[in-house]
């Protein structure tokens, strides 16, 4: 594990010691190297886990998320170069340091062996994210967004700490590997219901569940590009990861308690997809589509069958790469037209034909077209929910249709139509941006050749 953690820590002195013209090249190259090293964790044997030390372990659930986290840092650095070009040197270095610190916390969160350590690191990821949003966001509303983000996630996760201390008292350990062997069945009673809610609420807010999702569109819209990317791609997955880990402790009770939350996520999935159809703001549309995809994941995790777990893991990885790519595309539009309003930046296909190709591919990935892993994840989830209850097929079908509608709506509004007068003389697409899109799409297409490495612990 140290072969990833120590190089990530060493990226910080590298950032501060690099020459001004070498900062981006150095950090991007070295972080890409770290992400290539982390791919070795994906090659794991069956359902056993690698206990790397007393503090860290990886298994087939945390390894794909670990690889996703490390893969994202070089992409964030590549995406941020343009909008930081006018910033003073110290501020650039501080920004990169924040991103590296966030990656460090995320890696340790996904591989922590012990639940209290997991909780501390889970909370620690808030700090760099908050600084990135409130310091480098575009509009003045970023402070409001930061407050929303902080309070929603903190209020949601404070009961979790109390619940964890209570479990520690009862069981004597919070080690993930021990818990699987020692977990006592949890009968339904008032106190256990509260315990269940305390354990799950933190992750439900983080996912976010429909109704607790108000912080997400705000945070996404106000964050700079790297903030949006890491928020959509990795921070939402912390919720899913935590839920999958902690359901071991709450085994029989979840069967009774999950119903209202499943209904809420099924309903929310359709609601947020419908909200996407009437968005005028491009980033806001992508943020709401994230909520709708994560509702599928919540649904899958609460069904608690091997198939649904596999679907949830695959969907988390697929969504991480897809939404990150969509945010990059939205940002490349924003850098040229200086507006996120879709009406003002239409007809770009004539001016940026290669970008239009990337937009098409990203939209098709978002609506789960066959060769991508988005389809594999969604198929698993749809089948699992159908075998749980036949009626869900109506809701799932509706959701899939609306998803296709808003993806194509997003594509046609930004690419088709007559372009507006003020964007005649925009810059062409850079090699940097094309490389960025390629690095997002490559894993999505390659993983469809061998999806079993991201299907989680059951496969």
Swiss-Prot record:
| Major enzyme class | translocase
Q: Where in the cell is it found?
A: Mitochondrion inner membrane
Does the record's keyword annotation contain DNA damage? Answer: no
Q: Which UniProt keywords are present, listed alphabetically?
A: Electron transport, Membrane, Mitochondrion, Mitochondrion inner membrane, NAD, Respiratory chain, Translocase, Transmembrane, Transmembrane helix, Transport, Ubiquinone
Reactions that this protein is recorded to catalyse: a ubiquinone + NADH + 5 H(+)(in) = a ubiquinol + NAD(+) + 4 H(+)(out)
Topology relative to the membrane, per the entry?
Answer: Multi-pass membrane protein
According to the record, the segments passing through the membrane are: 22-42, 60-80, 98-118, 147-167, 194-214, 224-244, 256-276, 284-303, 308-330, 350-370, 391-411
For this chain, the family text in UniProt reads: Belongs to the complex I subunit 4 family.
- Write the protein's name: NADH-ubiquinone oxidoreductase chain 4
Provide the taxonomic classification.
Eukaryota, Metazoa, Chordata, Craniata, Vertebrata
């Amino acid at each position: 594990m140290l072969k990833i953690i120590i190089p990530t820590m060493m990226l910080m002195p590298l950032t501060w010691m690099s020459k001004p013209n070498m900062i981006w090249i150095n950090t991007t190259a070295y972080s890409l190297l770290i992400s290539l090293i982390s791919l070795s964790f994906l090659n794991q044997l069956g359902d056993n886990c690698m206990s790397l030390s007393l503090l860290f372990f990886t298994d087939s659930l945390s390894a794909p998320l670990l690889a996703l986290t490390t893969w994202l840092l070089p992409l964030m650095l590549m995406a941020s170069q343009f909008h930081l070009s006018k910033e003073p040197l110290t501020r650039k270095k501080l920004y990169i340091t924040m991103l590296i610190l966030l990656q460090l916390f995320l890696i340790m969160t996904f591989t922590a062996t012990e639940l209290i350590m997991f909780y501390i690191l889970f909370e620690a990821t808030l700090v760099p994210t908050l600084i990135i949003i409130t310091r480098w966001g575009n509009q003045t509303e970023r402070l409001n967004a930061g407050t929303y983000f902080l309070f929603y996630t903190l209020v949601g996760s404070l009961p979790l700490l109390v619940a964890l201390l209570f479990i520690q008292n009862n069981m004597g350990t919070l080690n993930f590997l021990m818990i699987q062997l020692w977990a006592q069945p949890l009968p339904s009673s008032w106190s256990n219901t509260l315990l269940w809610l305390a354990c799950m609420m933190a992750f439900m807010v983080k996912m976010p569940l429909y109704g607790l999702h108000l912080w997400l569109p705000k945070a996404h819209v106000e964050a700079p590009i790297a903030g949006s990317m890491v928020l959509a791609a990795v921070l939402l997955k912390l919720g899913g990861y935590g839920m999958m880990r902690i359901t071991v402790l709450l085994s029989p009770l979840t069967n009774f308690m999950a119903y209202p939350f499943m209904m809420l996520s099924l309903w929310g999935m359709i609601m947020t997809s419908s909200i996407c159809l009437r968005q005028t703001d491009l980033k806001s549309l992508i943020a709401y589509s994230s909520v709708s995809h994560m509702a599928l994941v919540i649904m899958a995790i609460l069904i608690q069958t091997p198939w649904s777990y596999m679907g949830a893991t695959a969907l988390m990885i697929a969504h991480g790469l897809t939404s990150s790519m969509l945010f990059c595309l939205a940002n490349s539009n924003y850098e040229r037209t200086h507006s996120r309003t879709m009406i003002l930046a239409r007809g770009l296909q004539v001016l940026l034909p290669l970008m239009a190709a990337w937009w098409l591919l990203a939209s098709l990935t978002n609506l789960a077209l066959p060769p991508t892993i988005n389809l594999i994840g969604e198929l698993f989830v749809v089948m699992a929910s159908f075998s749980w209850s036949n009626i869900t097929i109506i809701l799932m079908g509706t959701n899939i249709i609306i998803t296709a509608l808003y993806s194509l709506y997003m594509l046609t509004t930004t690419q088709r139509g007559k372009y507006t007068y003020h964007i005649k003389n925009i810059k062409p697409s850079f090699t940097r941006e094309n490389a960025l899109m390629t690095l997002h799409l490559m894993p999505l297409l390659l993983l469809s050749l061998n999806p079993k490495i991201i299907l989680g612990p059951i496969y």
